Amino acid sequence: MVMPGYKQTEIGVLPDSWDTITFEECFTILPNNTLSRAELNYNGGEVQNIHYGDILVKFPAVLDCSTEGLPYINKENVSKASKGFLRDGDLIMADTAEDVIVGKSTEVIGIGDSKIVSGLHTIPCRPRDAEMFAPKWLGYFINYCTYHDQLIPYITGIKVSSVSKSAISSTVIAVPPKPEQEAIAEALTDIDTLIVNLEKLISKKRAIKQGAMQELLTGRRRLPGFDGEWKEAAMDLYVDFQVGFPFSSAYFNSNSDGLRLVKNRDLKSDDQVYFTSEPYATEYVVENDDILIGMDGDFLPCRWQKGKALLNQRVGRLLPKKNLDVLFAYYALQKPLAELQNGTGATTVKHLSHGDIKKLIVLMPPTKEEQSAIAEILSDVDLEIEQLQLSLVKYMLVKQGMMSELLTGRIRLV
């Protein structure tokens, strides 16, 4: 049963006052070019180019060309480019990708006097009736699942996915009254601005942290109250390195039976969490703030914060001696471990040994107290970054909720 004031359409239930239009009715297809990355530069030129790879991984639903650094076409290749220069309100769709993200699009604004063309593996589109759409509406709607899910039956290819102009011609676009489009676009722009500003702040905090690490972990900057000479020392003077136990996969489960296992991949994500009901020795129990290091692939240390767990094979734990603040070691080891990883032979998977850790050379302060003071400063910055990241996740979820309500007309702003 459709609620009063709404109607059933080809793309689901929409408000009575919303129209629908097919892709073919909506757009004129513009020419694109086939220039590769090698034929572009960021130094300057006459004509700029929108590359499909940037649409897929970098550009938002609405691309402000006045603020985004677009690449230029190399001077010797300008003649190869199409002369289909873009205008504000044009939509660029990526027609090729490695998965179902194919079809991701961006609406361009802020072009001004710039000469900008659409590049390789794109479908540049111009609304036939520019007055039908408020700025940014198409950018937001075309990227929402109500539209994008219509592309899925038309995706072809196995290793590389693609869609064609002809195949998507019958896909359907919702057209609210223009004042409502404007109100929806404004609301989504506001949340996008908040998200972008948070991302910039996180980047700034990370840069501050990086600078602080370079100063504090080398002794170039000393904290008040500390003096004495820093010296290089092998880590075996400061830590023992415990390697995890080879728990039997016969006891592995994903239904929380027993204790969680810490496997190599768990240091980076929670995509696949396993538990084990196997009896264990307490020496392999991991607690929050333990410093763990993956021994296959990425060697970067992890400050464990996911509760009581069991240390599985090919994951190691730093066991500090009395003269070491283990949190300082977490920060101090990041650079030498990265260098060790990058210097490892080009095998399919890189491996770290128990001896590799103990032989690492680290510049150490003369006292444990100075180690702790440095670690506290860096930990505070990490906490700030973590809180900002949590806020970012929250606002991204808010945006998803707004889109699901506003782009379907379930909530009306006008």
Predicted regions and their residues:
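Short, solvent-exposed loop/turn positions at domain surfaces
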Residues: 8, 36, 79-80, 157, ...
